[in-house]
Structures are given as C-alpha cells and as structure tokens.
Amino acid sequence: MMKSIQLCILLWCWRAICCHSCELTNITISIEKEECRFCISINTTWCAGYCYTRDLVYKDPARPNTQKVCTFKELVYETIRLPGCARHSDSLYTYPVATECHCGKCDSDSTDCTVRGLGPSYCSFSEMKE
C-alpha cells in the first residue's frame, strides 16, 4: 500500500514538472509613448512556466549560483502604428514576440529580472478604448 502511494506521488510530481514546464503563452501588454499620452493593450506571446532550480544552503564562492528562469530563446519584433498620436510624432511602436522558450539565466540587458517588476499591464497614462 505504501509503495502505491509513493508511486502515485512520484507520478504526480513528474506530471507537474513535465506538463507545466517553460513554454510559450499568450499575454496582453499595455504599450505607451510619451508623444501619444495614452496606452493601448495588445496581445503577444511570451514565455511562462517552471524551471528546475535549486538554492544551495552553503554558498561556494568558487561555484556561481545561477537560478534558471523561464525566458525566451528566440525573439522576433513586430511594429504597430499607435492611433491618435499628435501630428509629426513618431507613432510607431516595436515590441518583442517570443517564438521559442527555454530555462536559462535571466538576461538583465533585455529582461526585467526583478522579483516584483511593474508587470506587463502597467501604464502611466490613461488607457485608450478601441
């Protein structure tokens, strides 16, 4: 009986790891430009899910401790024209679209690696309803 319970727990954990791994997901982000003074929401794809990681109890200075996160492996960029911007202003906005994901180190040059970032729906202006 105990072996059956242990096997069920093991299979459940395996399923949780395999079925909820790092993968593409649809998200809605708010985009804004200073010249336009409002936000619009657009749909794009980004990476989300779980990556195996561990934090050592005893830190070894000779061995760097890098936490792996679900992040993009490949990106493309799409450009849209924001409606309602002032004349003679640049109304084009380019945003990233993830096409492939993996578990890897967070690249702070291109990604918000903070624990509590502003989030994809943050907007400093009022939102324009289409």
UniProtKB/Swiss-Prot annotation:
<feature type="disulfide bond">
    <location>
        <begin position="39"/>
        <end position="123"/>
    </location>
</feature>
<keyword id="KW-0372">Hormone</keyword>
<comment type="subunit">
    <text>Heterodimer. The active follitropin is a heterodimer composed of an alpha chain/CGA shared with other hormones and a unique beta chain/FSHB shown here.</text>
</comment>
<dbReference type="GO" id="GO:0010469">
    <property type="term" value="P:regulation of signaling receptor activity"/>
</dbReference>
<comment type="similarity">
    <text>Belongs to the glycoprotein hormones subunit beta family.</text>
</comment>
<keyword id="KW-1015">Disulfide bond</keyword>
<comment type="function">
    <text>Together with the alpha chain CGA constitutes follitropin, the follicle-stimulating hormone, and provides its biological specificity to the hormone heterodimer. Binds FSHR, a G protein-coupled receptor, on target cells to activate downstream signaling pathways. Follitropin is involved in follicle development and spermatogenesis in reproductive organs.</text>
</comment>
<feature type="disulfide bond">
    <location>
        <begin position="106"/>
        <end position="113"/>
    </location>
</feature>
<feature type="signal peptide">
    <location>
        <begin position="1"/>
        <end position="19"/>
    </location>
</feature>
<dbReference type="InterPro" id="IPR001545">
    <property type="entry name" value="Gonadotropin_bsu"/>
</dbReference>
<feature type="disulfide bond">
    <location>
        <begin position="47"/>
        <end position="101"/>
    </location>
</feature>
<feature type="disulfide bond">
    <location>
        <begin position="36"/>
        <end position="85"/>
    </location>
</feature>
<dbReference type="GO" id="GO:0042699">
    <property type="term" value="P:follicle-stimulating hormone signaling pathway"/>
</dbReference>
<dbReference type="Pfam" id="PF00007">
    <property type="entry name" value="Cys_knot"/>
</dbReference>
<keyword id="KW-0732">Signal</keyword>
<feature type="glycosylation site" description="N-linked (GlcNAc...) asparagine">
    <location>
        <position position="26"/>
    </location>
</feature>
<dbReference type="GO" id="GO:0016913">
    <property type="term" value="F:follicle-stimulating hormone activity"/>
</dbReference>
<dbReference type="GO" id="GO:0005737">
    <property type="term" value="C:cytoplasm"/>
</dbReference>
<keyword id="KW-0964">Secreted</keyword>
<protein>
    <recommendedName>
        <fullName>Follitropin subunit beta</fullName>
    </recommendedName>
</protein>
<dbReference type="GO" id="GO:0016914">
    <property type="term" value="C:follicle-stimulating hormone complex"/>
</dbReference>
<keyword id="KW-0325">Glycoprotein</keyword>
<dbReference type="GO" id="GO:0007186">
    <property type="term" value="P:G protein-coupled receptor signaling pathway"/>
</dbReference>
<dbReference type="InterPro" id="IPR006208">
    <property type="entry name" value="Glyco_hormone_CN"/>
</dbReference>
<dbReference type="GO" id="GO:0005615">
    <property type="term" value="C:extracellular space"/>
</dbReference>
<feature type="glycosylation site" description="N-linked (GlcNAc...) asparagine">
    <location>
        <position position="43"/>
    </location>
</feature>
<dbReference type="InterPro" id="IPR018245">
    <property type="entry name" value="Gonadotropin_bsu_CS"/>
</dbReference>
<dbReference type="InterPro" id="IPR029034">
    <property type="entry name" value="Cystine-knot_cytokine"/>
</dbReference>
<feature type="disulfide bond">
    <location>
        <begin position="22"/>
        <end position="70"/>
    </location>
</feature>
<feature type="disulfide bond">
    <location>
        <begin position="51"/>
        <end position="103"/>
    </location>
</feature>
